[in-house]
């Protein structure tokens, strides 16, 4: 494994993450793929602050969440506690994970796979999925597919990529000169 960078190097602050990612508009998509059996074992890789993990657990599912970033997991544990849920949140790198158990459903949501920058790292993460997935299990991967024409045509324009308020009421606007 090439460990020149850490998964989550660029998304490490739970306040910023929650400020940017407070929508649950994609939750219905993931719920559609969940096993009908509520006793099924579910694993969310790159769970962040529990944005999806917690609502799925509230529906009665047995779910574990894995993330590399400690501040994200601390926030996830805090949210789960406030919701009266006991969820196992695990700090680990998805390129090296070994939980010693198999799951019925594993998913990597919300473009999180893009935190792996090299093919070998992606392959390592997919091997981890294979090693943790039951024989008849389901793996779901959500990733962004960019519009190359838009990127080329708008490469020099500045774009607002996010406006948000963190939990401590700080307002922020993030901009980029890179095409979106």
Predicted regions and their residues:
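Conserved class I S-adenosyl-L-methionine
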Residues: 1-48
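Class I SAM-dependent methyltransferase SAM/SAH-binding core
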Residues: 53-96
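A short acidic, Gly/Pro-enriched loop at the edge of an enzyme's catalytic core
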Residues: 95-105
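A short glycine-rich, Lys/Arg-flanked "PGG" loop and its adjoining helix->strand segment in the class I
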Residues: 123-135
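SAM-dependent methyltransferase
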Residues: 143-180
């Amino acid at each position: 494994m090439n460990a020149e960078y850490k998964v989550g190097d660029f998304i490490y602050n739970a306040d910023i993450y929650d400020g940017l990612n407070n929508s649950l508009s994609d939750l219905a998509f993931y719920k559609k793929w969940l096993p009908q059996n509520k006793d099924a074992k579910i694993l969310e890789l790159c769970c962040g602050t529990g944005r999806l993990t917690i609502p799925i657990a509230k529906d009665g599912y047995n779910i574990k969440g894995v993330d590399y970033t400690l501040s994200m997991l601390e926030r996830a544990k805090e949210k789960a506690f406030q919701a009266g849920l006991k969820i196992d949140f695990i700090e680990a790198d998805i390129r090296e994970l070994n939980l010693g158990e198999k799951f019925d459903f594993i998913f990597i949501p919300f473009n999180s796979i893009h935190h792996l920058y090299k093919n070998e790292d992606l392959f390592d993460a997919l091997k981890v999925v294979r090693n943790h997935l039951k024989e008849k299990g389901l793996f779901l991967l959500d990733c962004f597919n960019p519009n190359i024409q838009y990127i080329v045509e708008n490469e020099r324009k500045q774009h607002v990529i996010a406006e948000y308020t963190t939990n401590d009421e700080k307002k922020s606007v993030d901009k980029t000169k890179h095409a979106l």
